[in-house]
Regions:
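An anion/pyrophosphate-binding glycine-rich loop and adjacent beta-alpha core
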Residues: 270, 279-377
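Glycine-rich active-site loop/strand segments that organize a redox cofactor
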Residues: 66-108
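N-terminal Rossmann-like FAD-binding beta1-loop-alpha1 element of flavoenzymes
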Residues: 20-47
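Extreme N-terminal leader/targeting segments of oxidoreductases
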Residues: 1-22, 40-42
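Conserved redox-cofactor binding core of oxidoreductases
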Residues: 107-223, 243-244, 293
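Glycine-rich FAD pyrophosphate-binding loop
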Residues: 40-61
Length: 377
């Protein structure tokens, strides 16, 4: 599939099909939210979506929004938690290990609580109840949970552990659909927003001073252009489904796992920015997750590498375990635990789960376990 991005000089265009104040490229959670806010601030908005409907990765997600600060969100407060912006900033900066933009982190943390009220104003329902166990997504309808390493050393020494995961109240794992359905409904009721589906943004239109004045897109196999007076917002998602970009930026990680996400995560927005000589950061970062919990009791096993050495604290968030393994170039690790409530033993080898009814009969496993130096916990 051709993903070539083009920058078109305005002088070469015969005509624009329409004119707007703002063009938003990508109709997921970010794009839909940006379109509403722009329209509510007296802008005429065109919202482009490459697929036949909106949603993107947002609609596929659990929609666990990371929110807090400013004394805490209304949900945090209802569950008995107070959260300062300074505390939230300290945790996020520690998690990013110096790779974050401090101004953006501060801006986000100081406004996150108001973001939550905005989401609720769309009609998204949250139950004023917290699940404080170690889970990935709630199995019941609680809406507040821990979704990171807040209770894990060394982060717990940097900031007071506070649950900040806000998920729409439901039983299951489709919070993203709940949020996006509410967002989509709000967009349908918002004046000044036009939506164009099956429209692939090809690039931007610039004038003689290289100022962005429009957007080029293809719809019904016809290349068209719209003029924009205020600006273009790029919300086209990541590049997990673009093999060329994966090989360019994440080649050292391609052997670990398989791409997971929205089929249209082709990196179009990033490529448009690059074509305009914009700066990009952290392109070699990706989300890898090893989720061996729940149940929470599995935390009390140990992870060891092929030399039998423990390399991570097991109460870490699943993505941190995998990231540390990748950074330390650990291509194989073993997970050992004792749990009386299970009649089987689970061993994690080469990032895969193996269910072994009688592990003593596995010669391969016996060889692996002989190399393990047992650590008492």
């Amino acid at each position: 599939m051709d993903n070539t991005i083009i920058i078109t000089e305005e002088a070469t265009i015969d005509n624009y099909v329409s004119e707007y104040d703002i063009a938003v490229c990508g109709y997921g959670g970010a794009g839909g939210s940006a379109a509403i806010e722009a329209a509510n601030n007296n802008s005429q908005v065109i919202l482009f979506e490459r697929a036949s409907d909106g949603g993107g990765s947002t609609a596929l997600s659990s929609c666990e929004m990371y929110l807090g600060g400013s004394g805490g969100t209304s949900l945090q407060n209802a569950c008995g938690f107070e959260d300062s912006s300074e505390n939230m900033i300290a945790y996020i900066e520690a998690s990013l290990e110096g790779k974050g933009d401090q101004k953006k982190i501060k801006l986000y943390c100081e406004n996150a609580a108001s973001h939550f009220e905005w989401v609720k104003s769309l009609g998204v329902n949250y139950k004023e109840s917290a699940h404080l166990g170690r889970i990935v997504v709630p199995e019941s309808n609680e809406s507040l949970l821990f979704t990171g390493n807040e209770r894990v050393s060394p982060f717990s020494e940097c900031a007071k552990p506070i649950p900040r995961g806000h998920v729409p109240s439901h039983e299951g794992d489709f919070g993203g659909k709940i949020f996006f359905d509410a967002l989509k409904k709000a967009i349908s009721k918002t004046k000044n927003i036009s939506v164009s589906f099956d429209s692939r943004v090809l690039g931007l239109v610039v004038d003689q001073q290289n100022v962005i004045v429009g957007v080029s897109f293809k719809k019904d196999n016809i290349v068209q252009h719209v003029k924009v007076k205020k600006g273009v917002i790029l919300t086209a998602g990541g590049f997990v489904m673009n093999e060329e970009m994966i090989n360019k930026y994440l080649s050292f990680q391609t052997s670990f796992g398989a791409p997971y996400g929205n089929a249209w995560d082709k990196g179009d927005g990033i490529q448009i920015g690059l074509a305009m000589n914009a700066n990009v950061i952290n392109m070699d970062e990706a989300f890898f997750g090893v989720y061996f919990y729940p149940p929470e009791s599995l935390t009390y096993g140990i992870f060891v590498n092929s030399d039998g050495n423990r390399f991570v604290n097991e109460d870490s968030y699943g993505a941190r375990i995998d990231t540390i393994a990748l950074n330390k170039k650990i291509k194989k690790f073993i997970w050992l635990f004792k749990m009386r409530t299970l009649s089987h033993q689970f061993i994690l080898i080469n990032f895969r789960f193996w269910l072994l009814q009688k592990p003593s009969r596995s010669s391969k496993l016996r060889q692996d376990l002989k190399r393990v130096r047992y650590h008492q916990q």
